[in-house]
Amino acid sequence: MTTHNNNFGAGAAQMTLIGLRYLSARKLRTALTTLAIVFGVALIFAINLVLPSALSAFQLSLSAVSGADIHITSTSGEAFAPETVLPSLTALDSVRAATGILSRQFSLPGLTADTAAQITLIGIDPAQTVRQFAVSEGRFLQEGDTGVAVFPAGIAELAPELAVGTTFPLVTAGGLKLYTIVGFLAEQGNPSAPEIYVSLPDAQSALNQPALINTLELALVAGADRDASSASILQTLGDGFQLNAPAGSSSILGALEIGLALFNLLGLLALFLGAFLIFNTFRTVVIERRHDIAMLRAIGATQRQITQMIVIESLVQGVVGTIIGLVFGFLMAWAGVALMGGIWETYLNRGTLSLEVNLSAVAVAAGLGIVTAVVAGYLPARSAGRTSPLEALRPATPASVQHAARWSLIVGMGTMLLSVGLLLFTDSNGAATGALLFLTGMLIAAPSLVLPVARLFSPLLTLWFAREGDLARGNLVRQPGRAAITASTLMIGLATLILMAALVISFGDLVRKLADVNFSSDILILPPTIAVYDAVVGADPALAERVRALPEVATVGTLRYAAASTPVTDLQVLGIDPVDYPQVASFEFAGGDAESIFAALGSGHNAILTSIALSTLNLAVGDDLVLQTPTGLQTYRIAAVGNDILSFKVAAMFISQDNLAADFHKAEDVLLMVSLVPGADNAAALAGVQTILGDYPQFTGQLTGAYREELVNVTAGALDLFYGLAILILIPAALGLLNTLTINILERTREIGVVRAVGGSRGQVRRIVTAEALLLGIFGAAMGVFAGVAMSYGFILAFGAIGWEMPYTFPVMGVIAAVVIGVLLALGASILPARSAAQLDIIRALQYE
């Protein structure tokens, strides 16, 4: 037994040594294969550094400096009546004191010269029963104070002219209001979102939340067990409350988390293509080393040792590629944060964006990189280990190659026919499956298509390359499996490009369609951020009344906001007036007529859900939806599914403004839409609106037509970024082409020597390699076009499952770009291998083994 183990250990060491020597002897191939892992790991690592850093910066900007032991908020983050919970909390033995505060973080125009700054307005009880405030200058708030504020010392960095006794303008729901500064805190506070303290009644008035709070602060008795106290407090509160979570801003957090998931999918796709490249490389390596493997088997190497040798090679490349990828990923993340920092602070005002390295990001990227390399190398390794010595020494016969190609054609065509049936004759739920099946069928059928494609384009190559084209075709069809896998790598990249092109076109059409349907007003009164209303100070009904009083105005429709939670997801709850709103805007309804739907909204607890909300909650029209609100559990009946341009990308629901006020205590208008009387002068009406908005600097007025065009153009510009992402996906495809051509040169070294020995010039050898690369590029581009069209059609139909009925537009420019890029990639990838082949020494090439 000991002897057997020693022999096994010695054999494993020998196989490891042979594998390492093989990698070191073929440096270019090893480097190209390793680069695929480097790229995928770097992309995933960078994404998992940048977006979590953004999440962390955002969450930090929400956190107030506090000496309280425990914070309590509603699960929705909305304000609630303190008398519903305060008496039961103060009765607990572990609670020394409790107080309510009302806070909101929002953008404050004019705090700095260049941009609006982010501040946190906090209304508190001046009694300081829970935490103490040290003042460095002036005094703190006192009982009965109104119209006064206390600022943090760090405010001097933003507005050095402020001093005790000066006045400061704050935006409120009732318009701009001046507050007198009575003191500065000793603490610097959060410099990215300074905390301004006012009395609780002043905050309730400023935020139009009379007699409400959104946070309870608790101080525990000395020596109380924090965990036990927290459990007791939660039990006392019941459902609808949470401990130590910042109030509000769930919409931005959700958007950042969705962005993290989407970009991770991009990184995984890049890593998948890298795995495809490694699989192709090791499959080719096994074919090239058939004689070496046969000799090793003949002198006693076991199947396990052969498999082990090739797996070790893939493991080494995976480890090296992962280490290099982590370094490059960190550099990419550092550059990304540097580029995003200015935009983050200028437009989001959500803290300072800085790069944070976390072990989970390292572990995820490293684990995926190493595991991907080993898994991709294992299948060729197992195939090599199962090869007998005689089988390895025997060259593949044309009959066996044709037999394998025949079966790949039958299975591949059958899979593609099934996918076409799913694409054409099923609903949106089966469309994505059909698209993926078509791609799978193309991958399976690819080896059988090598010869027909080579014959089809051979006359074209003959025109460009004369006799070299025939030699290139022969080289390609000699190993159809290798050519198919290489072309398939290119196919996936080009299909992704076509898919992106189709999605950009169709999504742009959807946005334009929704904009035309929804924006039927003449003037829009807009908050600083659209569709993310957590950090918006709206206006009380007085603003809408003042606008209605203008002689040019016919109707004013308003939008109000609240947040709600369900066991499945958080929801935006938007309040509209069922009578006024249809006169200034509408929805893209998925069934039913608008008049009856709006009528239902005005009676009882009925709601319109966006398609995203409906699919996320897995509900249907007519079902009941139970929401956790500041007033407890409320049940709403789903009256319809409707999308509008501002909320179709989020989980949102629309209810009447009466229900919003009763269930959520919200009566702020966060967006106003104005329709003018026929024949009114738009410019004059806008001027009148802007005069009124001088008292409400948190809003801006714009003509609806101009804003519609701006929104469509901004969306189109943002969608164009997806083309850049698709180009990134093509990098592994280019590496695959370069790798395959390089391996072909090494495998055919003696053959190239013979060509040179019988009179072939260096230029002819170079043209042979270029022609072969061009054939591979054309083959991959052709498959990419078919796969890309099928995938784009299927995935666009699949969006119907979440209610996005996007029209399919054939991506003509995407197809043309894919073909051109495929050919250019092939020609570019051929430069180095062609030069290497042309420079081979004839004598050494003939002696090569």
Question: What is the predicted function of each stretch?
Answer:
Residues 47-48, 83, 91-92, 96-144, ...:
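The feature marks short, hydrophobic/small-residue-biased sequence motifs that occur predominantly
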Residues 1-13, 17-21, 25-32, 261, ...:
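Alpha-helical transmembrane segments, especially those used as permease/efflux helices
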Residues 65, 180, 184-222, 518, ...:
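Small-residue transmembrane helix packing/gating motifs
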Residues 316-348, 360-386, 414-426, 447-458, ...:
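Small-residue-rich transmembrane alpha-helices
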Residues 34-120, 164, 228-235, 483-572, ...:
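Hydrophobic, regular-secondary-structure patches
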Residues 57-58, 232-272, 287, 309, ...:
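Peri-transmembrane interface segments
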Residues 27-52, 257-294, 315-329, 367-375, ...:
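Hydrophobic alpha-helical transmembrane segments of multi-pass inner-membrane transport and secretion
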